Amino acid sequence: MPSYNHTSNGVNMANFRALGGKNTGRGGTYRAPYEWTLESVEQMGLGATENRMSSTLRDASSQLQAVASATVANDISIVDRALTTKLSQTESLKNMLETCLAEVISEIAELLSTKKRLEERNGKVQAKIGVNSNRMQVRSSRPPREMTMDEVEKGLIKQQGMLGSFSDRVARAVAQVDREVAQLEAVRAKLEADLRDKTEALRVDEAVLSIPTDPTVEGTLSPTFRRGAADCPPKTPHTWVRNTEDNLRNAHHWLADSARLRKAIAHAVANSRATEHDVANRLNENMLAKVAATRNLREDLQAQLEKVREEQARAKGQRSALTSALDDKRGPLAQARERLAVRKARPCRENVNDEVEAALAKEVAHLAAVTQQLSVKVAAVDREIAALDATAAQLESNIADKDDALRVDERVVLLDGRINLAQRPPSSVASFAMSDMSAPRTQTLARIRELEASLTSARREREAMESSIRQLRDTMGGGGAF
């Protein structure tokens, strides 16, 4: 096919026309017939050539138009498919971002709820620490005799240390939760920014897809979507997807870390609560047992004091009897001594160891011996009365200390808000509420209290029998002396 503006022989038509113009227009001269004929032939050749050139141009234009239409249609189809694929991919990433963002928001709410529960738990622990401190302070006011490192004191010290340690762990857990929330908030900000960009990208791509094939549309929508002055360099598709995947992967990492933290906190709180309730239950049992033991010991001391006072009364009665008997013997002794002294005044001739002399001497000796024995008994009874008085004073002092200790121990028990000792401690301070699961343990404790009561009763009976035996022995010893 000849090129445009050239003949089939390769002659350039522009140059040919320029040369043809030079051969025409010779005004005022004759031309040869040959030139005249040649001019027409050349012009006819030129016309034919122009016709061929025009036909060639029309064919080339038709082919170009067809190729251009096909190319444009294909390009538009490719762009539409690319936009549709991009919209689908962006929508998928947007959905994943929305799901992950919802999980992050939910996890932040769970962490804040965990923090609130920890703070409430720490408040209860601080209240228990206050009650425990008050108990230790009140218990320090017991009399010196009652200051013993008993199970109650050990339990209070153990509970104070345990509660302080748990309070420290709660504070550290709250700080860790705050750090975790800060990390999740940063993740949330990244996800929200990425989600906003994805939403805007969807809006832009949907607008691009909706632009019609119209010459008048150019310049109408682009100004409303034009980026700001701080343009950013374009990313590769791989980098674009990887950035979002990195955000999602980072979010899932912190979500898993937060879930592990909440699980660990829940496990630690459950264990500490179980340990705390167990220690509080044992402390409550020890306090009640201490009150019961102090009360029983005070009752035993009071019973013994009554026995000592009864023995004091009997000893004083015995002393009165001995004193009366001694007084009764002093008259006959004085009489016998006086008789013997008067009889010694007989003349020497009459100084005979006769029956009267022997009887008087024997009477004086018997009365002196009896008086001596009675005096010894009176002195012994006086010493015993003094010992009984001292014992009674010690018992009274001990009972007074036991009364003070009992009042202090009862006050210590009631510091948790109970009205009386029979009431169970509040569950927020001491132990769990009564349940069917604690029934076997309650029955066991009741059985232990019954056995302790039986043991106390048996001890009292034994002490009463020992006291009766001592009294019988004392009575037998006194009768033998007379």
UniProtKB/Swiss-Prot annotation:
Native species of this protein?
Chlamydomonas reinhardtii (Chlamydomonas smithii)
Q: Which GO terms describe its cellular component?
A: cytoplasm; cytoskeleton; motile cilium
Ranges for region Disordered = 311-330
Q: Which GO terms describe its biological process?
A: cilium movement involved in cell motility
- Report what the protein is called: Tektin
Note the Pfam families from the entry.
Answer: Tektin
> Where does the record place it?
Cytoplasm, Cytoskeleton, Flagellum axoneme; Cytoplasm, Cytoskeleton, Flagellum basal body
Q: What is its main location?
A: cytoplasm
* Stored PANTHER family: TEKTIN, TEKTIN-1
Q: Which family does it belong to?
A: Belongs to the tektin family.
Q: What keywords are annotated for this sequence in UniProt?
A: Cell projection, Cilium, Coiled coil, Cytoplasm, Cytoskeleton, Flagellum, Methylation
